[in-house]
Amino acid sequence: MKPMFNPSLMCMDHLNIREQTAILNERCDLYHVDIMDGHFVKNITLSPDFVRAFSKIAKRPIDCHLMVTDPDDYIAPLAEAGAGYI
C-alpha cells in the first residue's frame, strides 16, 4: 500500500490559500478538513461554506473529519459542498 499525503487545511495560511493549493494540488492525494462545532470539542474550525469555496480550486478529493455533536447535521451540507469523503 502506497502512503498517502493528506494535508490538513486547518493549518494552512488562509491569506495565501490559492498559492499553497496550487502547489499541493500537484503533490497531495487528498485534502483533510476538520469540522469542529465548539461543543463536541472546544475548537471551532472550517465549515461547509469553506468546503464549497475550496472545492472550486482543489484538484484532489476533500476528506472531512467531523468532530461535532450532531454529525447528521453536517453530512448532506458537506456532500453538497463538494466533500468526497466524510
Regions found by a protein language model. Give the residues of each.
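Conserved N-terminal beta1-alpha1 strand-loop-helix module at the mouth
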Residues: 1-85
